[in-house]
Amino acid sequence: MHGSVTVDELALAEELAGSGITGAGRVASADAAEYAMRLGDDALVLAQQLGMWITRAPELEEDVALGNIGLDLIGHARSLLHYAGTATGRSEDDLAYWRGEPEFRNAWLFEQPNGDFAHTIARQLVASLYLYELYGALEESADETIAAIAAKSVKEVDYHRDHAVQWVLRLAGGTDESRRRMILAVTDTWPYVDELFVDDELVTRLAADGVAVLPSTLRPAFEAAVDAVFTEAGLERPTGRTAFIASGGGRAGRHTEHLGPLLAEMQVLARSHPGASW
Amino acid sequence: MTDPEIPVLTIEDLGVLRSASVDETGAVRVQLTPTYSGCPALDAMRDDVVLALTHAGYDDVSVELVLAPAWTTDWMSEAGKAKLRRYGIQAPTGRAAARDAGPVRVQLAVKCPRCDSLNTRELARFGSTSCKALYECRDCLEPFDYFKVL
């Protein structure tokens, strides 16, 4: 149980229509804001990617499923980025639309292209199994706002992981072609796993205060979950391959070539009409 | 006050209304909690609450949106579940608190809200809104929405 944390402090206040809402406004420390921005950017970039599947998924039900998962992730991103913005007086929209590539803090996994459906599912599997362990642990965060967002998000991510797991089983156990593609997708995705579990200076400092969780401590549970799925699917967990992460990687604002075009599409409308609102 | 997406359920049935109080000066304070993080119906619900209270003669109304504790379908009232079924949406089966936490999940049968048959199948886990899955009854052959346990 956590204290009563209002969404006004966390997110929706300015964006929700109507008025009469006042929030006490819990302000994030500089470190907590940076941490919330990492988590928020992971969710935002992944949501944007999933949105690209709408009208293009293999079946109508998947358009809806990926759209709904993206919507949950947008919800998480809004709460997290709003909280991150309290440290510097920026709104969630300022952070989403008016930062350039080097200011984004997402890990490389989330900006890897959708590829074919199997690649999207492999990315979803890694992302949702990781986020499930992360948010589960953050429910106990000493930062009440982060704990509240995590407790809300973990239940939704549980459905996302179920979705990914079911598809991994189906593709791996389907036709020769679907199995071939699933294996290739897992192989291509795995080099981006390591970055998720790096303990850098910021998380180490925040973990000492009980605000963050050390990513390395999540890895055994993540791998056990992956192994349970892969055993059922007859797949092997790739080992020994890791992406070359330029100094600091996504958490330090150094990104692969895929983030730029994604941001351009996401930000063009807001930047063409600065200050416009619904 | 009903849910804009499921007009047979009040926000109290749904568990979205967490508290409402009036102080001695006549100021009303209402607490709402979102169902899913990205649920767009929350904006509409908040506006509807302000409108309804204003029409009822209260001019000092504040609506607070609360994230913790996180909303769960366990809060849905029994009356609400019965109304849902009559409307053609199967209510959550089982309790969120008792969900199996393993990564490879066993699916429980969901009853058809029209003919009560357990001979149904899931067409899509993500249905018309975030909170629902789409099912089909193999006996009466009707499709129906199922309100997922969260």
Residue ranges and their predicted role:
Chain B
Residues M1-L14, A56-Y58, R114-N119:
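Short secondary-structure junctions
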Residues V63-P69:
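AMP-binding/adenylate-forming catalytic domain of the ANL superfamily
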Residues A79-L150:
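Cys/His-clustered metal-coordination modules, chiefly Zn-binding fingers
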Residues T35-D60:
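Short, non-transmembrane amphipathic alpha-helical segments
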Residues T33-Y36, C137:
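Aromatic-flanked redox-active Cys/Sec active sites in thiol-based oxidoreductases
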Residues V8-T33:
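Short edge beta-strands and adjacent turn/loop segments
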Residues T72-M76:
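Charged, alpha-helical interface segments at or near domain boundaries
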Residues R18-S19, S62, T120-L123:
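A short linear hydrophobic-aromatic micro-motif
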